Amino acid sequence: MLKLAIPKGRLEEKVMELLKKAGYTFQKESSILREGEDVTCFMVRPFDVPTYLTYGVADIGFCGTDVLLEKETSLIQPFFIPTNVSRMVLAGPKGKKIPEGEKRIATKFPNITRRYCESRGWHCKIIPLKGSVELAPIAGLSDLIVDITETGRTLRENDLEVLDEIFIIRTHVVVNPVSYRTKREEVISFLEKLQEVMKNDNHEKSHR
């Protein structure tokens, strides 16, 4: 049996739609979904997906580039699935330059932010937050933020602007390396079904 880690929230609907097209229909039992005797899904927080795989609780998962880079995982990443593309960005108050000297940066992604600052040669004080990061510059908590944006609407509503694009965020299929060895046939069969669905979807779009 394959065990999948499915992220709750914005990616959940897209992932479940893909699985349904691949022939998997699930019956819900609290946060566990079962598809016959072949596949079990755990519905988990996006940031917990790599943990479920790393500790061998799940064989395959779905998570964003942001989670993979923040967690610094060594999971196999065979391909990504088509979802709305978002960006990890550095943003600050509109019309203001990036401050000289030490920069205070609020973020939900301290590891990504630390590596970004190091790559720029910046001396930064990183302020980890769980909630609305875009409020930090307004409140005077930080000079800048590092956060995810899709349309830029939330930034504009808070009088912020993008100062730098750090990377593009996609939704990756990830595989536990041990599962890839011990359940190779099951894993490959599952991945091929997903790829076939995506291939057919792309074919339909190109002929519209």
Curated annotation (Swiss-Prot):
Its EC number is 2.4.2.17. It is found in: Cytoplasm. GO terms for cellular component: cytoplasm. InterPro entries: ATP_PRibTrfase_cat (IPR013820), ATP_PRibTrfase_CS (IPR018198), ATP_PRibTrfase_HisG (IPR001348), ATP_PRibTrfase_HisG_short (IPR024893). Pathway: Amino-acid biosynthesis; L-histidine biosynthesis; L-histidine from 5-phospho-alpha-D-ribose 1-diphosphate: step 1/9. It comes from the Bacteria. It catalyses: 1-(5-phospho-beta-D-ribosyl)-ATP + diphosphate = 5-phospho-alpha-D-ribose 1-diphosphate + ATP. SUPFAM superfamilies: Periplasmic binding protein-like II. Transmembrane segments: none annotated. Keywords: Amino-acid biosynthesis, ATP-binding, Cytoplasm, Glycosyltransferase, Histidine biosynthesis, Nucleotide-binding, Transferase. Its main location: cytoplasm. It is an enzyme of class 2 (transferase). One of its GO terms (molecular function) is ATP binding. GO terms for biological process: L-histidine biosynthetic process. Gene3D superfamilies: Periplasmic binding protein-like II. CDD domains: PBP2_HisGs (cd13595). Catalyzes the condensation of ATP and 5-phosphoribose 1-diphosphate to form N'-(5'-phosphoribosyl)-ATP (PR-ATP). Has a crucial role in the pathway because the rate of histidine biosynthesis seems to be controlled primarily by regulation of HisG enzymatic activity. Lacks the C-terminal regulatory region which is replaced by HisZ. NCBIfam families: hisG. Heteromultimer composed of HisG and HisZ subunits. Belongs to the ATP phosphoribosyltransferase family. Short subfamily. This is ATP phosphoribosyltransferase. The gene is hisG.
